[in-house]
């Protein structure tokens, strides 16, 4: 079992890793895009301007007036660039220059869950936005989006982001650049896998409820509750593909269901194996209590914009966030 698990993890690392995927990466904010219809995961060397919301025109005219550095997507969990003495909340502007083939083509950029409001500019034009990143009129909205544009020669991507409430601020998921067909295929496959998984889990839930009604065995009832937790935790990829949501309570509920899944697994295992020890029940209670505490902490710390509290939550949920 251990060897099989490690083999599966290796396959995911090898074939589903946007940081090691084939394709050129940007160097000092410049990416050369060949004329071969390839897929590019924009993971590294973004030109990043901390603490400011900039438009392409402002960067063009006043670039030397602002501090910038090159960052990788997901390198830092907040706008603080790893400085624990600064607040992880705030604003920042990401910029990348694309050197495209001379023949004009249509491209698409897929953006996944940018926290928590942003404006996307391409070639100086506002292509779209989620929420309102203006700190004085801040409105958060999170949704997976795909934007298309036509380009040749040089193209500039600018993403101005503001976050005030989430555990991880800014761009945490690698954007993808390719033809509209390929970007939609990537998005569609991911969505299809999530839908199939959810449908399978739902049918298992129905079967578990049916068996519990017939046999009155506790293990079937517990397994049905476990399926509900799995559905709650696994629904967010589908939800974010179709609906714009706020940070809370959605992400707090995701964390709650995550911990409740562990509690459910331990209880189901105890009932199936027929053990009389109380240790699994105690551990399940601890996991459930941890889930409730993380949920409440996320709600309170997000509302209070507590950097210390959110750093602690980030550590507690690090495995969940990167899975």
Task: Identify the role of each PLM range.
Residues 1-102:
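Extended carbohydrate-recognition surfaces in non-catalytic/accessory domains of CAZymes
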Residues 22, 77-85, 178-200:
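Non-catalytic, glycine-rich low-complexity segments
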Residues 63-74, 125-144:
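Solvent-exposed beta-strand/loop surfaces of large extracellular or lumenal domains
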Residues 91-97, 106-108, 144-146, 154-156:
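Intrinsic-disorder/low-complexity, polar/charged segments enriched in Ser/Thr/Lys/Arg/Asp/Glu/Gln
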Residues 98-123, 157-159:
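Aromatic-lined ligand-binding clefts that engage carbohydrates, nucleic acids, or primary amines
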Residues 139-195:
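An acidic-aromatic loop/edge-strand motif
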Residues 195-323:
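Juxtamembrane segments at transmembrane-helix boundaries
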């Amino acid at each position: 079992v251990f060897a099989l698990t490690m083999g599966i993890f290796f396959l995911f690392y090898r074939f589903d890793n946007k940081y090691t995927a084939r394709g050129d990466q940007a160097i000092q904010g410049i990416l050369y895009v060949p004329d071969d219809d390839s897929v590019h995961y924009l993971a590294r060397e973004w030109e990043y301007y901390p603490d400011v919301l900039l438009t392409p025109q402002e960067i063009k005219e006043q670039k030397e007036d602002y501090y910038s550095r090159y960052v990788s997507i997901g390198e830092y969990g907040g706008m603080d660039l790893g400085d624990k003495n600064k607040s992880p909340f705030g604003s920042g502007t990401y910029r990348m220059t694309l050197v495209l083939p001379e023949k004009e083509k249509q491209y698409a950029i897929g953006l996944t869950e940018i926290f928590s409001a942003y404006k996307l500019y391409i070639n100086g034009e506002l292509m779209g936005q989620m929420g309102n990143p203006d700190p004085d009129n801040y409105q958060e909205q999170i949704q997976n989006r795909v934007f298309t544009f036509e380009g040749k020669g040089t193209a500039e991507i600018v993403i101005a982001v503001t976050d005030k409430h989430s555990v991880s601020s800014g761009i945490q998921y690698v954007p993808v650049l390719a033809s509209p067909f390929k970007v939609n295929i990537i998005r569609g496959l991911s969505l299809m896998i999530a839908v199939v998984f959810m449908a399978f889990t739902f049918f298992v839930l129905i079967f578990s409820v049916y068996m519990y009604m017939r046999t009155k065995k506790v293990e079937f009832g517990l397994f049905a509750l476990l399926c509900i937790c799995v559905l709650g935790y696994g629904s967010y990829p589908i939800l974010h593909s179709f609906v714009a949501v706020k940070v809370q309570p959605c992400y707090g509920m995701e964390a709650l269901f995550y911990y409740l899944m562990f509690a459910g697994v331990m209880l189901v295992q105890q009932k199936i194996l027929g053990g009389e020890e109380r240790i699994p029940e105690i551990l399940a209670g601890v996991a459930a209590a941890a889930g409730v505490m993380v949920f409440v902490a996320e709600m309170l710390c997000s509302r209070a914009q507590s950097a210390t509290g959110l750093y602690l939550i980030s550590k507690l949920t690090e495995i969940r966030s990167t899975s």
